[in-house]
């Protein structure tokens, strides 16, 4: 073998090695950069604890499994309008959302029980109902029926009635004729009717202008939402009805959920729990502090006959077509949860 032959052989081997190495060099960075994208939609505004909570969720995942997820938070209803998220998830157009029980009841009518006024007593009762056996049954049914996996129940707040112009409100009869903004589903509108008002459907993003122009006379939301969305600027009175201790469900589509390895699923659940804890603690704290803040803004704070509201609202639900579909014994189990 000559020196020339040896050189040619060495060159041939080098070229073959390079040919095999190039695809690896190209593929390896691509694999390293591959992330699971999770797009989350919420109607909440940036200052709301729910949006802040979603960034806690994002940060917790980034810390626990660096580089594995690309969590994209779309706030203020910019991706999907309020109430459209569940269907978007089912169609594969959205990965995650904060779903209301009203959204769920539209597809599973027997769960309208969870939309009933004066059902949940307080945030602690809420956590025990949704964090216990009832919540587990709820999650299984929703996964099987809707193709959506519930990750964590999240405290929305205790809903109060706020009015653009003050009026005497002691009982539901005093809300007769009041155009009370509610989200657009029939479950929400029924609640407004049960309160004695004239429920008026309006998108959350339009509530501020609606109060300002008189399109609506009032709206119902938890106090932290009143502040974060600056609705207090067009509010003259808050009536402390406390008619709904409200929950949202941080949820993920089954399509996105089933695509995750078991280890990633565990980290997603942990991140959801930590995010919910952050939200719940801050909302409970802020609800206690905001009464004085609103008084300082010149808003009249009034306490009605809550028992009169409770009896009227509960009677309306028990006589409705909704109650006919409630699972047997579930109301008693919710009431008995301590």
Q: Residue ranges of each PLM-predicted region?
A:
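Intrinsically disordered, low-complexity segments enriched in Ser/Pro/Gly/Ala and basic residues
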Residues: 1-3, 40
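Twin-arginine (Tat) signal peptide motif
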Residues: 3-19, 23-30
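N-terminal secretory/targeting leader peptides
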Residues: 9, 17-20, 33-126, 134, ...
